[in-house]
């Protein structure tokens, strides 16, 4: 219990930062305000439908600031808003002591209607781009329940601080603590994005962990498993000691906690704005191949239909010839019958008239009479 109050005091001591890029935007409205203005029930619609309604409201709302599109992961787009909020508020995490801590205890018992649209999308894991070139990750995300308090806490889905208060961490007001979900601590300057290290620059001093590993200021980016954040703030002279980093198990690129897969892919909040043409080439190749297959299939179907019509025409002609042949056979049989009957009638007695031959008369051709 003492560790919880110390964590709460540490959160309250961090500086407050308002999200200037979201002022005047519909994303700064609460869910109740959005439902009242549009007359909709957000809890019963899908995440895709909610994003579409927000986009249409931004187009029709006068004086509202356009914040760009919001991208949802495939596993999240078809889920219900109420189910997503329930999964967010009922997340559980088992700490090293074997206890179970409910995350709703740290979120101040917020309801879906009290939370802003921006904070809801952040907790759900949506990725979006605004007009300033940043991502939706730049907005405020609060654990204590205040939506305008920027804690600099990088929240992963279904994750919480593990064994945070096992070792007391000395606080310094000259630097800010960047807290990872695995329990590691590093110095962090607010509103600095995670970027690749340019040539000629190096990262600040890192923190000594309890397992003996130490990150120096000249450490390269080859070890991508460790989160390196540039910082210009001062660090206390003593090394900060924290519990060893215990990464959560992953399956197919998604973190799993307590045997359940998370809603999002790893690191959905970081958007560096880089684009790649490889995906476009692959899509164009797939499209060309699909068009070729469709054309071949249409040609095959056309040939089959033509062959079927030819067979049907030949079959009709054959049937007509067969019918005509049958008629001729019947006529021939009838003629034969008539001929036989006529012969029978001629052979019956009395039916044939016998004409007597006339008597032969001798005609004198020569005469002796003189």
Swiss-Prot record:
Pfam family, one: bZIP_1
Example GO BP: abscisic acid-activated signaling pathway
The keyword Transcription is assigned to this record: yes
Domain of life: Eukaryota
Location of Phosphoserine modifications: 25, 44, 69
Modification type Phosphothreonine: residues: 111
Region span, Disordered: 56-77, 260-281, 349-370
InterPro entries named among the record's database cross-references: bZIP (IPR004827), BZIP46-like (IPR043452), bZIP_sf (IPR046347)
Domain (bZIP) ranges: 293-356
Composition skew (Polar residues), residue ranges: 62-77, 260-278
GO MF: DNA binding; DNA-binding transcription factor activity
Sequence segments annotated as region (Leucine-zipper): 328-342
Record's subcellular location: Nucleus
GO CC annotations on file: nucleus
Region span, Basic motif: 295-314
Keywords: Abscisic acid signaling pathway, Activator, DNA-binding, Nucleus, Phosphoprotein, Transcription, Transcription regulation
The keyword Transferase is assigned to this record: no
Comp. bias regions, Basic and acidic residues: 354-370
Subunit structure as annotated in this protein's UniProt entry: DNA-binding heterodimer.
Family membership: Belongs to the bZIP family. ABI5 subfamily.
Function: Could participate in abscisic acid-regulated gene expression.
Name of the protein this chain belongs to: ABSCISIC ACID-INSENSITIVE 5-like protein 8
């Amino acid at each position: 219990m003492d560790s919880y109050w110390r964590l709460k005091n540490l959160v309250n001591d961090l500086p407050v930062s308002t999200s200037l890029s979201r002022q005047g935007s519909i994303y700064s409205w609460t869910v109740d305000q959005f439902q009242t203005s549009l007359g909709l029930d957000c809890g019963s619609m899908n995440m895709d439908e909610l994003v579409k309604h927000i986009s249409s409201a931004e187009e029709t709302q006068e004086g509202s600031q356009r914040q760009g599109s919001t991208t949802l992961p495939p596993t999240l787009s078809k889920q219900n808003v109420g189910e997503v909020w329930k999964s967010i508020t009922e997340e559980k995490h088992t700490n090293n002591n074997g206890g179970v801590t409910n995350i709703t205890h740290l979120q101040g018992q917020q309801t879906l209607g009290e939370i802003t649209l921006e904070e809801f999308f952040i907790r759900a894991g949506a990725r979006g781009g605004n007009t300033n070139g940043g991502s939706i990750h730049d907005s405020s995300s609060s654990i204590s329940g205040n939506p305008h308090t920027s804690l600099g806490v990088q929240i992963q889905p279904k994750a919480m601080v593990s064994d945070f208060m096992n070792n007391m961490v000395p606080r310094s007001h000259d630097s800010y603590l960047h807290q990872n979900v695995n329990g590691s601590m590093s110095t962090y300057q607010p509103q600095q994005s995670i970027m690749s290290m340019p040539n000629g620059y190096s990262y600040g001093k890192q923190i000594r962990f309890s397992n003996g590993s130490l990150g120096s200021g000249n450490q390269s980016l080859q070890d991508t498993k460790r989160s390196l954040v540039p910082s210009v703030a001062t660090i206390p002279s003593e090394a900060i000691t924290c519990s060893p980093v215990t990464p959560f198990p992953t399956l197919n690129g998604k973190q799993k906690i307590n045997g359940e897969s998370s809603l999002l892919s790893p690191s959905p909040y970081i958007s560096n704005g880089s684009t790649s043409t490889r995906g476009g080439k692959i899509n164009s190749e797939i499209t060309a191949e699909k068009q070729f297959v469709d054309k071949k299939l249409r040609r095959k179907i056309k040939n089959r239909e033509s062959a079927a019509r030819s067979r049907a025409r030949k079959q009709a002609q054959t049937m007509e010839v067969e019918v005509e042949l049958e008629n001729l056979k019947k006529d021939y049989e009838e003629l034969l019958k008539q001929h036989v009957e006529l012969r029978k009638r001629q052979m019956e007695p009395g039916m044939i008239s016998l004409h007597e031959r006339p008597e032969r008369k001798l005609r004198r051709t020569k005469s002796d009479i003189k």
